Amino acid sequence: MERSISFNPRGDNELPDDRSSDVGYAANDRRLAYSRSFQQSHGPRTPAVTEAAKPFLDRTVSSIDMPPDIYSVDGSDVFFGEGKDVDMAKVSVLEMVWEVFGVVTSGNRQMKRLFLLIALNVLYSTTELSIGIFTGRVGLVSDAFHLTFGCGLLTFSLFAMATSRKKPDHAYSYGYKRLEVLSAFTNALFLMFMSFSLAVEALHAFIQDESEHKHYLIVSAVTNLLVNLLGVWFFRNYARVNIAYRKAEDMNYHSVCLHVISDSIRSAGLILASWLLSLGVENAEVLCLGLVSVTVFMLVMPLFKATGGVLLQMAPPNIPSSALSKCLRQITSREDVTEVLQARFWEVVPGHTVGSLRLQVKSGIDERPLLQYVYDVYHDLGVQDLTLQTDYT
């Protein structure tokens, strides 16, 4: 017989965190949920359509009292106490944008600063694109498209900041915090691509022996540098290569800061190359573009690895593997535990670690002391949500 238990020793009326505070008691709380499977003595056969063929444990005859409005009883798709008047399919894109704009205007200082930075970049890129089209200068048009794409990524970061404030629902039971991790990963991926493109541009300049800068590109680089330096000052608290991420928004803020820093380095590289060319230094453009490419790559790689690890549900980096192994040895050493069959731990977002453990225990034991012990062991490591499955020998 198997039993799967999501265990928490706190009182029944105390929620583990704020993820269920808006949906009522036990809306997405699995502490008291369990499932059983029985080994049948007979072989496989075609089930008969009779009353006796119904499952031994049936949801319709469950003795667990569920609060109203948590599960639908009329076949509709309304769950977790959302109310039947909510229809997400009818929400228009304009209403969603307006809602996000309202959250931004009433949000924290970082969100308002990012909104101002995006507005400045949009104004500058639009002006640069217009001048490039009317004057026929392809360099300005190309740089304007680069800035526009960067504005799109910053807008996605702002959207993630606003949306992550939404409370969990039936579709996203863990909430929307991971959207900020996805936004940070997208920014890091874009910067990695920018580093690669700069390296290709440097190689092309070396092969073609192009060593001439146009003055209007220098003016564009100086203006872009000034705008990005304002963004660096806005997010100066995250102007580091390695950061201990304690929350999902730390990753997002860090990615925004690295985005504007990388753009600033790119603009500074163009200005430096033009100055060196004016001094008669050969291959100055190749040298500067190569240095910028390597610098951006080294800046972004730690963020790229951290966000990718969270999205791939890697083992939590804040918990040493030796500590997890020690906990497994402590659990296995108990007399009522035969074997630890499976142990999985990962981060939903930075600061929220979950785990799943499958234990083989001796039949006829009292599970409560064992569950309490296992919970205490992993809770001390920082595992917030722990699901246990027990198999009897």
From Swiss-Prot:
- The organism's lineage? Eukaryota, Viridiplantae, Streptophyta, Embryophyta, Tracheophyta
- The regions listed as transmembrane in this protein's record are 114-134, 140-160, 187-207, 215-235, 260-280, 284-304
Name-wise, this protein is Metal tolerance protein C2
Q: Which NCBIfam families match?
A: CDF (TIGR01297)
Q: What is its main location?
A: membrane
Q: Where is this region: Disordered?
A: 1-23
What organism does the record attribute this protein to?
Arabidopsis thaliana (Mouse-ear cress)
Q: Which Pfam families match?
A: Cation_efflux
Q: Which gene encodes it?
A: MTPC2
**Family statement drawn from the similarity comment of this UniProt entry:** Belongs to the cation diffusion facilitator (CDF) transporter (TC 2.A.4) family.
Give residue spans on the Vacuolar membrane side. Answer: 135-139, 208-214, 281-283
The record describes its membrane topology as: Multi-pass membrane protein
